[in-house]
Amino acid sequence: MAITRWFFSTNHKDIGTLYLVFGAWAGMVGTALSLLIRAELSQPGSLLSDDQIYNVIVTAHAFVMIFFMVMPILIGGFGNWLVPLMIGAPDMAFPRMNNMSFWLLPPSFLLLLASSGVEAGAGTGWSVYPPLAGNLAHAGASVDLTIFSLHLAGVSSILGAINFITTTINMKPPAISQYQTPLFVWSVLVTAVLLLLSLPVLAAGITMLLTDRNLNTTFFDPAGGGDPILYQHLFWFFGHPEVYILILPGFGIISHVVAYYSGKKEPFGYMGMVWAMMAIGLLGFIVWAHHMFTVGMDVDTRAYFTSATMIIAIPTGVKVFSWLATLHGGSIKWETPMLWALGFIFLFTVGGLTGIVLSNSSLDIVLHDTYYVVAHFHYVLSMGAVFAIMAAFVHWFPLLTGYTLHSTWTKIHFGVMFIGVNLTFFPQHFLGLSAMPRRYSDYPDAYALWNTVSSIGSLISLVAVIMFLFILWEAFAAKREVLSVELTATNVEWLHGCPPPYHTYEEPAFVQIQSN
């Protein structure tokens, strides 16, 4: 296995594997950072030195989990592996650009880690708001390194998005309409469009911040006629689509997993699912200011953003009830991916309901920047995106490796993880309703109980992460080969065996369309 195979790869399967390994590694780093946060908050009083180092850890935790764990795994890993197989394409449309998309990430990660090590680190929160992120409150190179890190990660994602859009539209057999491609392919397509439209706005915002810090411009400085609120609009115009970018591929995965383990040949309401994803993608761009209800917008502006945000619940509800309808009447196989998928549906819905609460601008004035918000977005990320990743991994592991995971161990792992994340994040709703603010390393004694419970939950999640590594080792050590795969007629990624050959569909796929 020459080193060139991995450094110069133009093969979608190899690049997908690189993304998965990188994402798993970054996930360990992000988990370590989250445990530092929960250790600090496990008791009143100080563990680390001060709020600056605490906020550096919080900021790094967010960036690592979003840009180096969830996105590389869902889009780069499963997207690369599955999209070409699902549409019968020999590879991605631009295989070398695909390689570059991946190799921009390790330098980007390096820059982010470097930012923590110079001066006092970037303790700005992931939104990097000026004036805190300006050159007075954050003198030194920390924030600049963070900005360059984001630039690289952004270029990587934009190139990946171009690649996925071209591949999904252009590389499928001519006889097949877009409405005959699997839902995961659709989810990656919608995600890629969101990336392509939102990331340039982030790039503009952080570039202006860079020049404010180093070239004496005043885009975000009132002293020179600028406005820090402009930065917030630019950031959240990216930031809100970003959260849908994180969850949409998960929606696609859950559709596949639920249909497969219900013994159905397709999910319920295919067209409804597709349109729901497109609606979520569109609406995701016109709700950004709900992150800014406390900055003093007009009451009519707040009314609009409240209503628009609530409308997103409709296509999301279409998806949730379609998953439940897919289960209906099926012969359900209670295998581990199905457990992850059912956990996803329930916990994502809980997270969505707290999101509806927060969409009310009047309520959000009180709940903004409290642990209620932290609980909300960790329910949709730590139990939405992560559960989708786990469902996908356990479901497609035999396809990726040719080996099967130990079914009992993976079920125990699911149970431990389920208890861990819920024990970590459910109490945070109580803290938020008691007005405990985010981004502080210490708190009054009144909040001690639920913080201690939350920190114990984080240790249970750590046990789950270690169990997962053991399960992975066990599968490769035991080498149980795949015997047979069911439902391949409607799950075409499995058609070439486990694992598929290095090159698939070297000749164009022959497709016969049944006319109804």
From Swiss-Prot:
Mitochondrial matrix-side segments: 1-11, 87-94, 171-182, 262-269, 328-335, 401-406, 479-516
Protein location: Mitochondrion inner membrane
EC class: translocase
CDD domains associated with the record: Cyt_c_Oxidase_I
Main subcellular localisation: mitochondrion
Sites where the protein binds Na(+): E40, G45, S441
Function of the protein: Component of the cytochrome c oxidase, the last enzyme in the mitochondrial electron transport chain which drives oxidative phosphorylation. The respiratory chain contains 3 multisubunit complexes succinate dehydrogenase (complex II, CII), ubiquinol-cytochrome c oxidoreductase (cytochrome b-c1 complex, complex III, CIII) and cytochrome c oxidase (complex IV, CIV), that cooperate to transfer electrons derived from NADH and succinate to molecular oxygen, creating an electrochemical gradient over the inner membrane that drives transmembrane transport and the ATP synthase.
Name of this protein: Cytochrome c oxidase subunit 1
Organism: Cyprinus carpio (Common carp)
